[in-house]
């Protein structure tokens, strides 16, 4: 086994000194595939232990997974990296220290995004939306805009921003549901659940929205069928 590992490391060294791992990890992260992105980045660190792009990505991945301590360990390894203040702000967001994020006064595209996220968590939705508009539409910004329009009671305005990653499709289904477009919501949610693991919180979120879409369309049989599936993965009052 050790020989196989050594060969894999040697091939990685020959392949690209970590840079290719960073690019692959970044692509997986952009697609929302956090586990695959993490595994790829960790292999990249074996090849190039101080690769800053890999370290930055690992901080983001662990924060997205709610693993603040692990993120902090990688953040400490970055030292005085130019992106470190923004990543520290993300750690503050993960810890619920939203006003501290605003107090940092971070500028630029990333700074605007972080301030918008803090404002969202503080319930200052219109201010968050004003900051989020005009940002480059990567996955995180698309999701933020979708959530803001949902929370502001203008769900259909958020639909056009969302892409086709599983998290975005589930949110799009919720927006369509809230906007009364039940057939479209049910179709999207039915499709995306086949792409999700039953252990995923996103799977449960998709099922919960699909139940509402089915019952909203007066599809009692379909609604109870999905409700039964939901009861298998989540404790529901009065069921089981």
Model-assigned labels for residue ranges:
Residues 54, 84, 111, 141, ...:
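TPR alpha-solenoid repeat register
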Residues 37-42, 68-79, 97-108, 124-136, ...:
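Alpha-helical repeat scaffolds
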Residues 30-31, 64-65, 94, 121, ...:
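Register position in tetratricopeptide repeats
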Residues 2-8:
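Sec-dependent signal peptide recognition
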Residues 195-201:
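Flexible helix-coil transition and linker loops at the boundaries of alpha-helical arrays
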Residues 9-69, 73, 83:
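N-terminal leader/linker segments that initiate helical-solenoid repeat arrays
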């Amino acid at each position: 086994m050790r020989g196989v590992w050594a060969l894999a490391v040697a091939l990685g060294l020959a392949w690209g000194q970590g840079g290719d791992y960073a690019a692959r990890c970044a692509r997986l992260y952009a697609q929302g595939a956090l586990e695959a992105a993490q595994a790829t980045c960790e292999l990249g660190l074996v090849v190039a232990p101080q690769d800053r792009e890999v370290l930055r990505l690992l901080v983001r991945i662990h924060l997205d997974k709610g693993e603040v301590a692990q993120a902090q360990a990688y953040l400490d390894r970055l030292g005085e990296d130019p992106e470190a203040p923004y990543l520290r702000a993300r750690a503050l967001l993960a810890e619920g220290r939203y006003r501290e994020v605003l107090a940092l006064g971070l500028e630029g595209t990333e700074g605007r995004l972080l301030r918008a996220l803090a404002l969202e968590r503080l319930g200052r939705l219109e201010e968050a939306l004003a900051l989020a508009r005009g940002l480059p539409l990567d996955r995180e910004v698309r999701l933020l805009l979708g959530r803001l329009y949902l929370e502001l009671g203008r769900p259909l305005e958020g639909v056009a921003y969302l892409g086709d990653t599983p998290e975005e499709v589930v949110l799009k289904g919720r927006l369509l549901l809230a906007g009364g477009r039940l057939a479209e919501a049910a179709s999207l949610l039915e499709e995306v659940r086949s792409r999700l693991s039953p252990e995923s919180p996103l799977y449960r979120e998709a099922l919960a929205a699909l139940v509402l879409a089915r019952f909203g369309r007066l599809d009692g049989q379909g609604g109870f069928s999905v409700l039964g599936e939901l009861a298998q993965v989540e404790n529901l009052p009065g069921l089981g």
